């Protein structure tokens, strides 16, 4: 995302007060569109959370549109975005363009029910969280228990949001599980597949 932001085009608008220029993401933010593009980390999470809170302050009833193209990333950073999406009053509509893997798919399915969508050639991946802690054996056991609890929490939330049983998602997430958009629709991660933008969409 940081590399992408270095190549951001500018948009110039004319008004009665003269000419104003915006980077493309700022201009889209005015339309209540937020991009999650690239790996999920603390920096990206802070930016997305700040934009969610800003748009809610502007209008707590008007939908926010979160466009996702992400391979996933840090679980804690993803949970920060998930909790913020649930915390704000404005409904968050999610759309996968490209891919939504790991924490990306978690955020995709966390959108407002009925508004979670994907483009036809998007790909979606679910799996259990992983960790790479090194250190003393006693500390490794502590971290292993934390990962186990995180896995349980994520599995439960997938099941709740998607209308499936805990056991179904526990089995599906045991290894990397790639899905087409049609499979994601059947599993309840999304509500629809969009080929053309609808008038009501952002």
Curated annotation (Swiss-Prot):
Its EC number is 3.4.21.92. It comes from Agrobacterium fabrum (strain C58 / ATCC 33970). GO terms for biological process: protein quality control for misfolded or incompletely synthesized proteins. SUPFAM superfamilies: ClpP/crotonase (SSF52096). The gene is clpP1. This is ATP-dependent Clp protease proteolytic subunit 1. GO terms for molecular function: ATP-dependent peptidase activity; ATPase binding; serine-type endopeptidase activity. GO terms for cellular component: cytoplasm; endopeptidase Clp complex. Cleaves peptides in various proteins in a process that requires ATP hydrolysis. Has a chymotrypsin-like activity. Plays a major role in the degradation of misfolded proteins. InterPro entries: ClpP, ClpP/crotonase-like_dom_sf, ClpP/TepA, ClpP_His_AS. It is an enzyme of class 3 (hydrolase). Keywords: Cytoplasm, Hydrolase, Protease, Serine protease. The keyword Cell cycle does not apply. Fourteen ClpP subunits assemble into 2 heptameric rings which stack back to back to give a disk-like structure with a central cavity, resembling the structure of eukaryotic proteasomes.
């Amino acid at each position: 995302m940081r590399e992408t932001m270095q190549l951001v085009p500018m948009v110039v608008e004319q008004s009665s007060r003269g000419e104003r220029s915006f980077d493309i993401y700022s201009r889209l933010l005015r339309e209540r569109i937020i991009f999650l593009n690239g790996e999920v980390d603390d920096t990206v999470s802070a930016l997305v959370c700040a934009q969610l809170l800003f748009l809610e302050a502007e209008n707590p009833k008007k939908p926010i549109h979160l466009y996702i193209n992400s391979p996933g990333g840090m679980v804690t950073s993803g949970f920060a975005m998930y909790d913020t999406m649930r915390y704000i009053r404005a409904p968050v509509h999610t759309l996968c363009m490209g891919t939504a893997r790991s924490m990306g798919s978690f955020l995709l399915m966390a959108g407002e029910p009925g508004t979670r969508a994907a483009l036809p050639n998007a790909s979606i991946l679910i799996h259990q969280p992983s960790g790479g802690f090194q250190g003393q054996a006693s500390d490794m056991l502590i971290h292993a228990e934390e990962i186990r609890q995180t896995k349980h929490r994520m599995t439960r939330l997938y099941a709740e949001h998607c209308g499936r049983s805990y056991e179904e998602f526990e089995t599906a997430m045991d290894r990397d599980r790639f899905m087409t958009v049609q499979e994601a629709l059947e599993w309840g991660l999304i509500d629809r597949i969009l080929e053309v933008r609808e008038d009501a969409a952002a």
